[in-house]
Amino acid sequence: MNFNKKTIEDVQVKGKKVLVRCDFNVPLKDGVITDENRLNGAMPTIKYLVDNGAQVILCSHMGKPKGEAKPEFSLAPVAKRLSEMLGKEVVFAADDNVVGENAKKAVAEMKDGDVVLLQNTRYRKEETKNGEELSKELASLAEMFVNDAFGTAHRAHCSTVGVTEYLKPAVCGYLIQKELKFLGDAVETPERPFVAILGGAKVSDKINVINNLLEKVDTLIIGGGMAYTFLKAQGYTVGSSLVEEDKVEYAKEMLAKAEEKGVKLLLPVDHRVAKEFKDVEAVVTEDQNIAEGFMGLDIGPKTEAIYAEAIKDAKTVIWNGPMGVFEFENFNKGTIAVAKAMAEADATTIIGGGDSAAAVNILGFGDKMSHISTGGGASLEFLEGKVLPGIAALNDK
């Protein structure tokens, strides 16, 4: 996949109507946005366009309204908050059919530097099916397209891919540019040693990632629930820990592949365990084995030290997925240890979105990382070596 895409700085935007696909898929509680990370992420692109005299038409999805106009998925609160953040009115076009009379009127009346936000694109069924009609309607509003929603770059939808058939030029905003730079460099030309850390519950979610990264990394660290499938493959006892029985053979293949490629594959050498899936006091095991009746819920202190050492020696580190049950205070230690080691490392440190990003932000290490990806699913597919349709659809430099 070509990562060298045209950006908003490569096109003339003054006086032009510019459709921008943002990622405003933010959590709401009682109509108030509870996490503004994605709004903050979109600001540099929106401000650049406003400051350079573009007429800015924003669009995004939120949640899964499944093709129906459900008020709880309305982008009205986003328009309100964006107005406050920009210090100027963001006109909200509240059309249930997204590109309706309100949108057309608002867009027709725009002056340079004005901003309009369209209603949730997933109010229309065809959005997720990449239907021609909505793609054409969105394209008809503007003279060029900017994609700045990395979080949906792995989806071929109307507002990410379909619209580019009818609207050129199609370029990326600052957010996607930054994602492509950090993730692209890490995967294509990393500074070595290159260490990848994978956690989370299931091996099945990360099969292609493990396979692809074993071709590229010097060290692969595995924690979280998926470690138990690997330990079982090595013949250790795992008690009542989460194991994907149908993936034990696959784990054996990956262990063999790591050896063949000369990749260090690090697995837990001790665990924090409990008798039930609850936030109870942790029992620390002596070694890799977990006794009958106990389940592994986090990596142990010896493992933390080994993982931290590997991170300390690295020049590029990429992390996706927690080391244990991060929501339980007794079992968040491994995740904290990895986050801390990355924060202190003299390396390019990349967090692959999702749970790891949330953990790093909660722990206050966010500003110590080189890059926190805004797309969990998209960054995983990127690490699998897949082409992301939303990126592929943009014009090359």
Swiss-Prot record:
Pathway named in the protein's UniProt entry: Carbohydrate degradation; glycolysis; pyruvate from D-glyceraldehyde 3-phosphate: step 2/5
Catalytic activity: (2R)-3-phosphoglycerate + ATP = (2R)-3-phospho-glyceroyl phosphate + ADP
Binding residue positions for substrate: 23-25, 38, 61-64, 122, 155
EC number: 2.7.2.3
Tree of life domain: Bacteria
Signal peptide: none
Coiled coil residues, start to end: none
GO biological process: gluconeogenesis; glycolytic process
Binding site residues for ATP: 206, 296, 327, 353-356
Subcellular location: Cytoplasm
SUPFAM superfamilies referenced in this protein's UniProt entry, alphabetically: Phosphoglycerate kinase
InterPro entries, A to Z: Phosphoglycerate_kinase (IPR001576), Phosphoglycerate_kinase_CS (IPR015911), Phosphoglycerate_kinase_N (IPR015824), Phosphoglycerate_kinase_sf (IPR036043)
GO cellular component: cytosol
GO MF entry, a single one: phosphoglycerate kinase activity
Keywords: ATP-binding, Cytoplasm, Glycolysis, Kinase, Nucleotide-binding, Transferase
Major location (coarse): cytoplasm
TM region positions: none
Keyword Lyase annotated: no
Subunit structure, as described in the record: Monomer.
Family: Belongs to the phosphoglycerate kinase family.
PANTHER family per record: PHOSPHOGLYCERATE KINASE (PTHR11406), PHOSPHOGLYCERATE KINASE 1, CHLOROPLASTIC-RELATED (PTHR11406:SF23)
Protein name as catalogued: Phosphoglycerate kinase
Species assigned in the record: Clostridium perfringens (strain SM101 / Type A)
